[in-house]
């Protein structure tokens, strides 16, 4: 690529150590979506704060109109807490235009048994034909009713497929494969 000798390239894909992530077949919050990531403009969390059933976790940055005083913002989780509690949710969302490949947080969600609702930029190496992977088209990001409908549809499917989702995550994104 770009003139590099491919025999001397080593690609190290991003992945998650699935054994570190707590997994439950029945989530504690099956009707809730987790939006996990640094609060910043490219991830557009500020657009989705009015959607009931979405909780936001991540380091707050004052570069966006996201209101950190709302009940739906849970602050930043410590790593060990994240490992234990990602599995509590029905699914995860990430609608960002600044991703190069599938972000680690999406792979973590899958190994924890969560379906995902993502942008095409966050779905690089996901099998988008799977019923628990929903890709929101660019022209629908600001259509809050559409996004909410897709979150609900994905959650309903995802909470019934937790074992399959986890297995897909382990088979495709775990360091253990």
Model-inferred region functions:
Residues 1-23:
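Donor nucleotide-sugar binding/catalytic pocket of nucleotide-sugar-dependent glycosyltransferases
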Residues 87-101, 114:
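Acidic donor-binding loop of glycosyltransferase active sites
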Residues 106, 115-119:
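Short hydrophobic beta-strand element within catalytic cores of glycosyltransferases
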Residues 25-43, 49-55:
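Conserved donor-binding/catalytic core segment of Leloir-type glycosyltransferases
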Residues 139, 155-177:
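A charged, aromatic-enriched C-terminal amphipathic alpha-helix characteristic of glycosyltransferases
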Residues 130-142, 151-155:
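Conserved acidic donor-binding segment of nucleotide-sugar-dependent glycosyltransferases
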Residues 83, 106-111, 125:
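Short alpha-helical segment that forms part of, or immediately flanks, the ligand-binding pocket
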């Amino acid at each position: 690529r770009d003139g590099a000798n491919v025999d001397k390239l080593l690609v190290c894909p991003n992945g998650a150590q699935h054994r570190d992530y707590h997994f439950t077949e029945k989530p504690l919050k099956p009707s809730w979506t987790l939006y996990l990531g640094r609060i910043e403009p490219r991830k557009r969390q500020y657009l989705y704060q009015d959607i009931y059933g979405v909780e936001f976790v991540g380091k707050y940055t004052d570069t966006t109109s996201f209101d950190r005083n709302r009940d739906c913002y849970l602050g930043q989780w410590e790593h060990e807490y994240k490992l234990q509690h990602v599995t509590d949710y029905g699914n995860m969302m990430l609608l960002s235009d600044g991703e190069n490949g599938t972000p680690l947080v999406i792979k973590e969600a899958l190994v924890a048994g969560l379906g995902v609702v993502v942008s095409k930029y966050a779905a690089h190496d996901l099998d988008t034909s799977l019923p628990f992977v929903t890709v929101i088209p660019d022209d629908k990001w600001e259509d809050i009713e559409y996004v909410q409908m897709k979150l609900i549809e994905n959650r309903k499917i995802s909470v019934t497929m937790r074992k399959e989702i986890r297995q897909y995550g382990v088979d495709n994104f775990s360091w253990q494969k």
